[in-house]
């Protein structure tokens, strides 16, 4: 789920401004630890030329924008639980100190990466305490003690054959939305009713896989920190550390195939996280594939498809009138020139204006209709994120008995943190070209892009377009492949058409009929069908050879 409220709020500043060419501005150093939003304020005085004009235009039309950019929210209140309350504590420094002898007779570290600052706390969750599922469960925190970061996770074993079934890491997007949303709203073992009871989900993805739900980056959901993470690359190192320590504690899961799946802004996260894992030759993470659902990964290719989706060319009736559709067409050239500048420099000074302008001018007309940006068939209900169920989930997870059962240490749970969303936006992360990492991953493993076809915000047209435009050695074969019917093959609905699939080698695209931004919510049977078959390797270079 993507949170667009902040970008749309400030977007009018430059959408209403005169046409300008965006020039490359000072490049921020991603290795600098200084908070990125403060860096923008400090460096603003040094901008020159048209870049200055662009930011002056923002400030002129939204006078308090620099206060918004530099606002630092207070850290979450928390109560650190004593070590005696945890069943296991895994010390990264101890793991990093382990050396083994390789086949060549040379000694090397058992696992790579900088782990000395990390610990993993593990709590065995009593299944009877909450009744979410009867399977074995673990929850806890990855602690980065050096940087005061604490990431919360919740693990569920497979309902089927946990000794042999694969392990899946699930990531929601935002940026800044809790993966416990995915757990209780989409693909987890239970949903939450209006009276805050758990309701068994027969289509949970842990039907045939063990699943880890991770609240990341810090200050999302039950996670917390005195600082912040504001770009995808920094978050990737935390995820690698968590998985490494988790599989060290539970080697029985480390031997299984491992997959990363997620939706929305996870289209940014997953290519980075998978690349971070594969960058370590010595690892205990058996990564076999990645899955991105209704993701944002290649904005330059995806943004031109917002107008067709909103204006009746995506398989559903038009949401916008002709004048609004024309305004999107008129704004697109400037939007694309800004994204191109962002792709060229990958600097906040070009990527931030692109995000603000394009989100207002290209996405804003739809957002202002009051329709659900995650499902073109419905109106928006229940606040900015449009789903009343999110309120029920938050109430459930804010109960003291739930927090105690899981070992949660924060005082409050929120489904989405808009401060995180703002931080990523003003770091320039939103528009960056993370699709450039995908060719390297396709060379190593199967990659799936799936898209519910009723979603507007990360619509199937845009995802299909960037899949077909991606330059990699198998591009020609994938581009030439036909879209074929995707049908249910192994249950009482056998033969039912649930979408279309296009696959060549290790790259696959799926369109899921009747699914919105969150396919497992709208089409639970279809989502479990394709997930089970994907985990069995049905669409891969090996299966097609």
Curated annotation (Swiss-Prot):
GO annotation, biological process: proteolysis
InterPro entries from the UniProt entry: AB_hydrolase_fold, Peptidase_S10, Ser_caboxypep_ser_AS
Signal sequence region: 1-17
Subcellular localization(s) per the UniProt record: Vacuole
Residues with attached carbohydrate: 208, 485, 491, 506
Cellular component aspect of the GO annotation: fungal-type vacuole
Active-site residues, record numbering mapped to chain: 264, 455, 517
Propeptide part(s) removed at maturation, as residue ranges: 18-123
EC numbers, comma separated: 3.4.16.5
Disulfide bonds: 177-416, 311-325, 335-358, 342-351, 380-386
Family matches, as Pfam families: Peptidase_S10
Swiss-Prot/TrEMBL catalytic activity: Release of a C-terminal amino acid with broad specificity
Keyword annotations: Carboxypeptidase, Disulfide bond, Glycoprotein, Hydrolase, Protease, Signal, Vacuole, Zymogen
Primary subcellular site in the record, as a coarse category: other
MF (Gene Ontology): serine-type carboxypeptidase activity
Enzyme class, UniProt record, top EC level: hydrolase
Family of this protein: Belongs to the peptidase S10 family.
Protein purpose: Vacuolar carboxypeptidase involved in degradation of small peptides. Digests preferentially peptides containing an aliphatic or hydrophobic residue in P1' position, as well as methionine, leucine or phenylalanine in P1 position of ester substrate.
Protein's name in the database: Carboxypeptidase Y homolog A
Species the sequence originates in: Blastomyces gilchristii (strain SLH14081)
Gene: CPYA
């Amino acid at each position: 789920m993507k949170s667009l409220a902040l970008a749309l709020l400030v977007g009018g500043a430059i959408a209403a401004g005169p046409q300008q060419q965006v020039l490359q501005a000072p490049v921020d150093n991603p290795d600098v630890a200084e908070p990125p939003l403060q860096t923008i304020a400090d460096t603003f005085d040094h901008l020159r030329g048209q870049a200055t004009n662009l930011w002056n235009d923002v400030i002129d039309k939204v006078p308090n924008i620099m206060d918004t950019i530099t606002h630092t929210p207070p850290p979450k209140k928390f109560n650190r639980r004593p070590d005696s309350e945890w069943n296991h504590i895994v010390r990264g420094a101890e793991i990093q100190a382990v050396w083994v002898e390789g086949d060549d007779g040379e000694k090397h570290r058992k696992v790579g990466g900088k782990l000395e600052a990390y610990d993993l706390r593990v709590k065995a969750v009593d299944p009877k305490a909450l009744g979410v599922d009867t399977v074995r469960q673990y929850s806890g925190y990855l602690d980065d003690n050096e940087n005061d970061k604490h990431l919360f996770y919740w693990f569920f074993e497979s309902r089927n054959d946990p000794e042999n079934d694969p392990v899946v890491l699930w990531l929601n997007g935002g940026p800044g939305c809790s993966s416990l949303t995915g757990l209780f709203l989409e693909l987890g073992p239970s949903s939450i009713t209006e009276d805050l009871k758990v309701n068994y989900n027969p289509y949970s993805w842990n039907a045939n896989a063990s699943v880890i739900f991770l609240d990341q980056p810090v200050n999302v959901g039950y996670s917390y920190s005195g600082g912040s993470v504001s770009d995808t690359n920094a978050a990737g190192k935390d995820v690698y550390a968590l998985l490494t320590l988790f599989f060290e504690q539970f080697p029985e899961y480390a031997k299984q195939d491992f997959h990363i799946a997620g939706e929305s802004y996870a289209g940014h996260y997953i290519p980075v996280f998978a690349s971070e894992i594969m960058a370590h030759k010595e690892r205990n993470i058996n990564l076999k594939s990645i899955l991105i659902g209704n993701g944002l990964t290649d904005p330059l290719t995806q943004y031109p498809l917002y107008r067709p989706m909103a204006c009746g060319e995506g398989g559903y009736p038009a949401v916008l009138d002709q004048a609004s559709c024309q305004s999107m067409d008129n704004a697109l050239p400037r939007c694309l020139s800004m994204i191109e500048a962002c792709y060229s420099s990958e600097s906040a000074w070009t990527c931030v204006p692109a995000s603000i302008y394009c989100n207002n001018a290209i996405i804003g007309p739809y957002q202002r209709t009051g329709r659900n940006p995650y499902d073109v068939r419905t109106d928006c209900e229940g606040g900015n994120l449009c789903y009343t169920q999110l309120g029920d989930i938050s109430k459930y997870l804010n109960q003291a008995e739930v927090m105690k059962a899981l070992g949660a240490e924060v005082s409050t749970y929120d489904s989405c943190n808009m401060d995180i969303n703002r931080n990523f936006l003003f770091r320039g992360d939103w528009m960056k070209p993370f699709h450039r990492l995908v060719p390297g991953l396709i060379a190593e493993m199967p990659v799936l892009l799936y898209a519910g076809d009723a979603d507007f915000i990360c619509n199937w047209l845009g995802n299909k377009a960037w899949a077909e435009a991606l330059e990699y050695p198998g591009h020609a074969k994938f581009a030439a492949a036909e879209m074929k019917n995707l049908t249910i093959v192994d249950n009482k609905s056998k033969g039912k058409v649930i979408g279309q699939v296009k696959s060549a080698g290790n790259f696959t695209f799926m369109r899921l009929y009747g699914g919105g931004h969150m396919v497992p919510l709208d089409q639970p049977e279809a989502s479990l069908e394709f997930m089970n078959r994907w985990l069995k390797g049905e669409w891969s270079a090996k299966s097609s050879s």
